[in-house]
């Protein structure tokens, strides 16, 4: 009888293999990289969380910051494994109480992200986590919000990177380390 552990050792799939591509969603010409299939598979989800953790082994991290919405799923799991707190950064109007806001550019227009004004303390070291790095606008807004509260961003971790959209260059240009588990060409 084969044990689950034995089965896992022989499975050669990568994180990328668990991500499905949906053509023409949400608009014609878009290849949507869907991580829900990764999250739904226990082995795939564990693999992604373990690889995100490995990238920051040895870093002193006080909190994990997750970007709405799939960053909450990943960030919560990473925070749990690190035994640190989790802080959500949400779209405008979704957090109760006192918040600070940061506008950022979208392809057509602007959006606003918010964080509770007491979510981070000066000097805390935080890891920002999200599922996807495209243009980097959302992550840059997250970096700004963390910085305005006095926290130090030790890195930005993503499952997927879409390299041709320039997000890595933006975040590295702001002086932040970027780690992505896989990259897909043809956004």
Curated annotation (Swiss-Prot):
It is found in: Cytoplasm. It comes from the Bacteria. It is an enzyme of class 2 (transferase). It holds the Pfam family Pribosyltran. PROSITE patterns: PUR_PYR_PR_TRANSFER. Its main location: cytoplasm. GO terms for molecular function: adenine phosphoribosyltransferase activity. It catalyses: AMP + diphosphate = 5-phospho-alpha-D-ribose 1-diphosphate + adenine. Keywords: Cytoplasm, Glycosyltransferase, Purine salvage, Transferase. GO terms for cellular component: cytoplasm. SUPFAM superfamilies: PRTase-like. This is Adenine phosphoribosyltransferase. InterPro entries: Ade_phspho_trans (IPR005764), Adenine_PRTase (IPR050120), PRibTrfase_dom (IPR000836), PRTase-like (IPR029057).
């Amino acid at each position: 009888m084969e044990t689950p552990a034995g089965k896992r050792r022989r499975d050669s799939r990568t994180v990328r293999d668990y991500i499905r591509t949906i053509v023409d969603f949400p608009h014609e010409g878009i290849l949507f990289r869907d991580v829900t299939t990764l999250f739904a598979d226990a082995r795939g989800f564990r693999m992604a969380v373990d690889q995100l953790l490995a990238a920051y082994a040895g870093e002193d991290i006080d909190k994990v910051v997750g970007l709405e919405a799939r960053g909450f799923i990943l960030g919560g799991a990473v925070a749990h494994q690190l035994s640190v707190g989790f802080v959500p950064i949400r779209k405008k109007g979704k957090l109760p109480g006192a918040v600070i806001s940061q506008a950022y550019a979208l392809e057509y227009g602007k959006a606003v992200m918010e964080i509770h004004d007491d979510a981070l303390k000066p000097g805390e070291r935080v890891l920002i986590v999200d599922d996807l790095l495209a243009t980097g606008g959302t992550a840059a807004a997250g970096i700004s919000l963390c910085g305005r509260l006095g926290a130090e961003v030790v890195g930005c971790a993503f499952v997927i990177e879409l390299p041709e959209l320039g997000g890595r260059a933006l975040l590295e240009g702001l002086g932040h380390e970027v780690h992505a588990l896989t990259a897909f060409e043809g956004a």
